[in-house]
Amino acid sequence: MVKCGASCVLGSDLGTSATKSIVLDSRGHIRGWARQEYETSRPRPGWAEQHPHDWFNAFCNTARLAIRQAAVNPEEIHAVCISGITHNAVLLDENDDVIRAAILYTDVRSQTQSDALLHEWGAEILNRTCNLLSPVWTWPQLRWIKENEPKVWRRVHHVLFPKDYVRHQITPSFLTDTIDPVGTCLYDPHRNQWIDMFCADLELSPGAWPKPTEPWSVVGTISKQTAKHIGLPPNTPVVAGTTDTAAEVFGTGALRPGQTTIKLATVGRLSTVIE
């Protein structure tokens, strides 16, 4: 094992098809990296689901391999941060166990629910959330579960998002950042708060929704069990993290109004800074 001569961080991204982890030093050099794919279940046409356990396993495996490849003193890795795919809700019961597979943003089963919500709320959704509702957003997906899987829905105690679920496994906290909730169409990005009248449609306890914090906030330290498994000290700080797209836009340097990032992945995206 050698010293890299600079502070390092461990970053992981939970993608649609795979999780990628890297060890990055303060000069921007990648010291180690790893990638692990997972399956998407498609039980019916237009449906797409993944199990959150697969994300956590992929994080642990790729983090361990990236740290090993980096060949640095684990004490030199000063923080862990996770980004991830959006619009996907992880449903937990009162024991923090996953209730069902997560419906992906590529799933369109909730067209009926999306149409009904647009009929009920109209332009109010766009005005409050700055987004046009469709089946790929979390609100209609959750309403589909509420209407079609009532036994499942009655067990829901907490709602998290992919990167928040994995982070919760390594440092328990029911938190999210201020960007991930925007993908639900249940969140006001101007006030950085959940929209009570929209959330009330799903009839969940107000405590079910994760508390938003800034993406760069330190939210805890890695648990002893996870630290031992991936090869880090148990006191390593864990940062809140954010969505994959937000991290990509920032990473490409698109910071001023008019600058644009084009993303080519499972789903292409064009992101332009407006203010």
Give the location of each predicted region:
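N-terminal glycine/serine-rich phosphate-binding loop of ATP-dependent small-molecule kinases
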Residues: 1-101, 127, 155, 227-228, ...
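Gly/Ser/Thr-rich active-site cleft segment
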Residues: 14-16, 125-245
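Short, small-residue-rich loop/turn micro-motifs
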Residues: 34-40, 114, 170, 202, ...
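Signature tryptophan residues that serve as conserved aromatic anchors
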Residues: 47, 55-56, 105, 137, ...
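Generic alpha-helical structural signal
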Residues: 56-60, 64, 111, 115, ...
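Glycine-rich phosphate-binding loop of actin/hexokinase-like ATP-binding domains
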Residues: 89-114, 155-156, 160-195, 236-275
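Conserved FAD-binding subdomain of flavin-dependent enzymes
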Residues: 119-123
